Swiss-Prot record:
Glycosylation sites: 46, 139, 177, 225, 282, 625
Domain of life of the source: Eukaryota
Glycoprotein in keyword set: yes
GO annotation (BP), single: chemical synaptic transmission
Residues exposed to the Extracellular side: 25-324
Protein's membrane topology: Multi-pass membrane protein
Organism for this UniProt entry: Caenorhabditis elegans
Function text: Possible acetylcholine receptor.
Coiled coil: none
Cysteine pairs bridged by disulfides in the record: 238-252
Record topology, Cytoplasmic segments: 402-599
Name of protein: Ligand-gated ion channel 4
Name of a matching Pfam family: Neur_chan_LBD
GO cellular component: neuron projection; plasma membrane; postsynaptic membrane; synapse; transmembrane transporter complex
Amino acid sequence: MIICYSCLTVSILLTIKFVPCRFAGIEHQNTKSRVHFSLLDSRQENDTNHFEIAEAKFQKPHNEENTIGTITKFAPSVQEQHSSAVIPMPHFDQNRLEQALRIKGSIDGTEEALYRSLLDHTVYEKDVRPCIHHSQPTNVTFGFLLNQIVEMDERNQALTTRSWLNINWMDPRLSWNESLWSEIKAIYIPHARIWKPDIILVNNAIREYYASLVSTDVMVTSDGNVTWLFSALFRSSCPIRVRYYPFDDQQCDLKFASWSHDITEINLGLNTDKGDLSSYMNNSEFDLVDMTAVREVVTFPSDTNSDWPIIVIRIHMHRRPLFYVFNHIVPCVLISSMAVLGFLMPPETGEKINMIITTLLSMGVYLQSITESIPPTSEGVPLIGMYYVSSLLMVCLATCVNVITLNMHRNGAANQGRHVPAWMQKWILGYLATFMRMSIREPDSIALLKASQSKKSTIRRSSILRDLKRVKNMSNVRAKSKEQNANRECECMDPLVHIYAESIMSCLAADTKPMNGSTIREDFASESTFLGRVVSDGIMPRISASSNSVLTEFETRFRRILKRVYRSLQQHEIREEILDERSRIQWQWQQLASVVDRLLLCLFCTATLFTIICLLIVPVAYRDNDSMLSFLNFF
């Protein structure tokens, strides 16, 4: 064998002695098709077997580009097949020939040999759990690195995270002596070629679980320590606590455990109590408050004899409420404040109810548009849902109370002069109006009417009697002065005035019953005919002894006419008093409605502020208080 090697070397040197260049070795360009060239190393004992492997590899080169180099490397094998022939070398450039002729030590197949030695199917079985003795558990260390919170799905109650897992265990079958393998400390093996613990996400919320895993090669060290690093997009189920939404804190758990092995076979542990946040990317909707890792040992009811270790990654998040405040709460507050304009609008316009109903419809349409963003759960009502319902209820109550105030405003005309109750005048128009800083000032006409009613409507009658007495006294003075004249006669106006005064006084003094309208019209027509005949004929009664009969008839008829005139004036006065009284009553009801409307306006504003404070501010500020939690759980 040594003689063959020597002859082959001499042949190669004689073939290339005319090439004016230096020769250099070339490294193999395809690392995946590494070949055992240990036959060239005199340190290997089993050189014959390795030579056969190298010869087999030589016969099947990987590509045409490396064919020449491969032929050059495996020249001993070729010489063994063609011992008497010299391989003709084609013409190459200087650099390629230099690299092709540096063979010894250029390619080291130790790692590949180690790979084949470790994963030989006669020695290693990937479906068998690694352990020194079958009664001993395999200790698996679990590490979790949170990279990003991708999404929180409130409707489906699922959390999507992008994470990196670091799983480590000991496999004695994958250990080697570094001194025998060129001081190789670690190699990388595809994860599908070795045994791996069947650790899965227990609370997985996606069907294609393994499709989201991005696994890399497994690193194996010389002492049998196996490290498996891989990235995954986990979608885990997370019960959403919607009580304080959108000012809520969420705590989601990712539970990892072995699906097939209990604690007697795989002992799952943690490499640290805190999760790794060194590569965390901030989320636009949630702030990460804290992340902890906890190891728990549970016993399932179906298998009480076995304990199962579970790694719980607990993620504590706080929602950023700025988006919900500007897009959900502020518009609702503005729509609710529009109901205030319904209280300030005058009732005479007839648009109070239309204004409130328009606000109510706007609130309903807005709530319909944002319903999709509220988590659909029946375990609790969120704060924003309570606020929406409270705002809608207050707008409905504002519509009802505006109907009441409108009816109160028209109560005087509708009830045909029904007086305001005394207690309402005292408490509402009196104390409440003063408390609400409202000045109730009566018009001048109503003030005069109240003054006349306080004297029982005697002002006009007493003034008439006073005027008639003054006229009678003046007529008596004139009569006495005229009696001293020679003819002892006077014109018709003096006796007429005298008769007029006496008739009016007798009518006022008499307690006569009022006549109906037809009788007054008939008597007035007959008396008007008589007076017209007297005026047209120029019949003027004079005071004398011969005219007593004419004067008596004239006095009787004129007295009757005066009665009718007085009764007409009296009825007109009564009608005016009734209309004035109704105006006063209607004014009182209007003032009562104004005071009540102002009171309801203050109550509505107070209720709106109270709702905002109690449902949106206080629960957020005192969310950790037990009394506040019990108060909210009441709803």
